[in-house]
Structures are given as structure tokens and as C-alpha cells.
Amino acid sequence: METDNSKKMIIIGVVAIIIIAIILVIINRKPELVYTISKANDGTDGILITSKSELDDLVKKIGIGENIETNKYKKATLSERYNDEFFNEKKLAVIAVYEDDSKEYIHSIDEVIYDSSKTTATINYTYKGDIYLGTLGNTWYTVMLVEVEPTVTTLNFVNSAQK
């Protein structure tokens, strides 16, 4: 009888530890980071896109290419990924970085940090020209569109490569 009780206590203890571990993982989970990279003819920074029509205006203004690559969804088009349904749930933060044929560039979004009310998003990104290739001529902007929470009203961009 006593061994049955001790077995039950061990099982209850193991289940409790598993439940606590799951709760801690959920509490400490960071929001999913999704961003898009595309080429453009012109640059702009710090813009918060809140609707499909605003995105369409930006595409016309700076010439963002229709084909995009996301860090989660491989290849798509702007209109497929960022439709009216998307803007019901999220907003887009925009950062554009200048590139040319003279260097090999590294660019990525590292993390998005929100304040407690989720109205301010700090976007840590990496951008640096890495290896000098010795050519110059073709220039463009690489536009990174970062998906942020719909409550965001203020953006801060921090280049991790300059820290």
C-alpha cells in the first residue's frame, strides 16, 4: 500500500514539473519575428504602414519589387502576403538600406522589442557592407518590411552592427 502511494506521489510530482515547465516556456516566449526583404529604387525609413492602400502608395513611391522573400514563408508576392486581411491583424514597419555592387552586404532583422503597452516597437537590425568587391555601378535599396503588432504607434530602429 505504501509503495502505491509513493508511486502516485512521484507521478504527481513529475506531472507538476512538466506543467510548470510548459507555463514557463509560454510566459518567456518571444513574439514571432517575420520580416520581408525586397529591392527598391528609392529609400525611406521609419514608416509604419497600417493599410493595403498605404503599402500600395509606398510601392509606387519607392518602386518596391513585387517579389518578396520572407524569413518564414520563402518566396511570395507583396499582394499575396500583405492583403487587407493581414492589415486587420498586423502593421508593417519599413526600413530601407542603400546597397551597391562594390560590397557584399549583410542585412537582417534581429529582434523586435515592445514596451509594456505594445505601442512602441524597437527593431534591432543588422546592416553592414562586408567584403569590398571593387566594383561600382549598380545601386539599389534593400527594403525590410517588419511585421509588428497592431497597437504599435512609434518605431525605433537600432543597427546592431554599429553597437
State the predicted function of each range.
Residues 5-163:
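Exposed, flexible binding/inhibitory loops of compact, secreted disulfide-stabilized domains
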Residues 1-3:
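Juxtamembrane low-complexity tails/linkers enriched in Ser/Thr-Pro and polybasic
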